[in-house]
Amino acid sequence: MAGQVAGKVALVTGGASGIGQAIAELLAEEGASVVVADVDELKGPEVVAGIEKAGRDAVFLQQDVTSEPRWSEVVAEIARRFGKLDVLVSNAGIGIGAASVVDMSLADWRRQTAINLDGVFLSVKYCLPLMRKTGGGSIIMMSSLAGLRGSATLAGYSATKGGVRLFAKSVAMECASAGDGIRVNSVHPGIIDTPIWGKIPAGATASGQNEPIDFAELARLATPLGRPGQAREIAQGVLYLASDASSYVTGSELVIDGGMFAGAAPRRT
């Protein structure tokens, strides 16, 4: 069914690559005017150019989600250009290399928290008033499978994503109490084929070098479906939550992980 978000205006943070890019492209494909927000001033415009080449509407806004003054400017620009905001996808986030709690630096903990959690808080704080003026909409917060269960050596990341999960539920209840027509949900991807996996070290090898995680093999062994997910598969879930098809869905968790959270399955040889 084409045009599932036709006429809507959507903001996607972290929209220049990976899952964010896939979300921006799919929402535009389905009829939304998309604001691609990202710190990357090279890739962001490229994503927008690709969307426009396909005959769709998009604009790039440079944004550091941890900057409160910039949030005020971004929302003002959206209001000026479009006059409304229907969909907020709080996707921007980072994963810092695996480390035990003892070895993790406070600086890394704070940086991860600033982007993954503070950035989501600021997105809601500044976008919610415009969405209320619009008359309703959908807020989608990107959490993770790591936000549903503990992960050894990823305590900082899991803490931020678990925080996003409960923040989404709290905002959902706040919006429901206000009767503002805004639904709020979180999305929890599992092992997804995105550039971030090439930056996560598996640990020191016999040679003493930190090698990147072999995410394809990890997914084959850890995921009941036996493969990593694709960014567009996450985007399809976001599209559902952004569209009117999910009009009775709020405060929920959409887990898209190939069955990892459900339980164990026989390992493939």
What role is predicted for each listed range?
Residues V124, T160, A168:
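Active-site helix of classical SDR
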Residues A176, G181-R183, V249-G251:
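Short, small/polar-rich loop/turn modules that mediate ligand/substrate recognition or access, typified
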